[in-house]
């Protein structure tokens, strides 16, 4: 689909267009394909407009807030809605978008719902009624306004008179940390509650899952996705890393199966840059990349890929030299990755920092160092953090740990409890 849109975009751009308007769209995935295609051809402004049903969602189930979150992260210059309903029904969707929009919003309603009279399609909303509701749309947050089906020059003239002197709504200047699937979104807040990333969809150590994947079956993947959603996961990690399969194709197949089974946003997890890129290209939402370190391949190639596809990423404080020797080195890596991200237009709102958990049995100070990282990220860097609890859990099962070590860790947890995301094995 991207290639089809690229062919059109290339011709339109060469013909001298000033901007692109992708409108009356019913699928968020098609919107993504169009924006990606245009951005791969030129840098002209892009406006994207979807059409919504009476239930406030597109035909494929996307709500207004999710649409603006995904499309503005992908690089759209304005997002909104057109057609489908009369102007009154557009007020609430515009308000929903305005809560998250960092780009201008547009609204182009019909002149009411169409009626068939004596074989002729008729729109009942008068220019005066249309203009009156148009002012409410501007108050709701629309910065660009117009008309769609059934509107006439008289409707647009009345609209201009009604809204011409109204102040233009300015989008939010502070971004929010948002992830999204095609049908829902979640926010990662520094002052918010714990969030859970379900990480069971990973063949490592799971012989039954490995055998099934080698047979080309994703039945267990679907079951694991459903079980984790039912048990409270808010984000699902997808990892297909194992020998004996086409990992890239299996990742793409798994994403399709999981997004068809549950609504949760996904975390794309692979050690291969090309696999993450392929996954981000087809994922119908805003994903979390697991992960980007200061290693050359990750920082030079994967970071721009995350930017291109509008993804957030987990910052892993590692470098080509391996594990940091101490907290100071770890802090330096975090600062440098943030600097590199900001240099290409990303920011703190696009990042979650991995605490880099080591096993307590091997290093009794591991938990304290981990919590020190959490404290540094939250209090000095204003960055949320992520912690792999399976490391602690397996350590408790297999390695002896003294009461003193456990008490020290427990006390530290009580003092520094504000992790923001807690990956967990269900």
Model-derived segments and their meaning:
Residues 1-354, 358-426:
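Domain-level signal for soluble alpha/beta catalytic cores
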């Amino acid at each position: 689909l991207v290639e089809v849109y690229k062919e059109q975009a290339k011709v339109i751009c060469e013909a001298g267009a000033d901007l692109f308007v992708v409108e009356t769209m019913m699928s968020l995935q098609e919107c993504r394909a169009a924006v990606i295609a245009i951005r791969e051809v030129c840098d002209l402004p892009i406006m994207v407009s979807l059409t919504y049903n009476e239930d406030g969602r597109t035909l494929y189930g996307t709500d207004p807030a999710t649409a603006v979150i995904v499309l503005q992260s992908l690089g759209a210059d304005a997002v909104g809605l057109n057609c489908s309903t009369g102007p009154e029904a557009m007020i609430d969707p515009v308000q929903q978008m305005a809560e998250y929009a960092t780009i201008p919003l547009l609204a182009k309603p019909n002149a009411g719902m169409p009626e068939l009279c004596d074989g002729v399609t008729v729109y009942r909303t008068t220019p005066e009624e249309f203009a009156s509701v148009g002012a409410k749309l501007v108050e709701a947050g629309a910065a660009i306004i117009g008309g769609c089906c059934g509107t006439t020059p008289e409707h647009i003239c009345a609209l201009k008179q009604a809204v011409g002197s109204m102040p233009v709504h300015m989008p939010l200047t502070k971004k929010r940390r948002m992830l999204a699937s095609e049908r829902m979104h979640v926010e990662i807040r520094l002052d918010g509650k714990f969030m859970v990333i379900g990480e069971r969809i990973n063949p490592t150590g799971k012989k039954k899952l490995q055998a099934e994947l080698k047979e080309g079956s994703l039945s267990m993947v679907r079951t694991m996705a459903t079980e984790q959603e039912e048990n409270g996961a808010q984000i699902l990690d997808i990892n297909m890393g194992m020998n004996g399969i086409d990992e890239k194709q299996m990742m793409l197949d798994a994403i399709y199966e999981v997004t068809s089974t549950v609504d949760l946003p996904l975390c794309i997890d692979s050690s291969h840059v090309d696999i993450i890129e392929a996954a981000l290209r087809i994922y119908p939402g805003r994903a979390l990349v697991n992960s980007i370190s200061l290693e050359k391949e990750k920082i030079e190639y994967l970071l721009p890929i995350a930017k291109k596809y509008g993804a957030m990423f987990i910052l892993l404080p590692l470098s080509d030299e391996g594990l940091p020797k101490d907290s100071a080195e770890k802090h330096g890596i975090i600062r440098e990755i943030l600097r590199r991200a900001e240099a290409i237009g990303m920011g703190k709102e696009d990042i979650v920092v991995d605490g880099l958990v080591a096993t307590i049995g091997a290093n009794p100070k591991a938990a304290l160092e981990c919590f020190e990282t959490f404290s540094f990220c939250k209090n000095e860097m204003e960055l949320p953090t992520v912690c792999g609890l399976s490391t602690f859990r397996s350590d408790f099962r297999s390695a002896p740990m003294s009461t003193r070590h456990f008490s020290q860790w427990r006390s530290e947890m009580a003092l520094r409890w504000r992790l923001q995301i807690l990956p967990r094995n269900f």
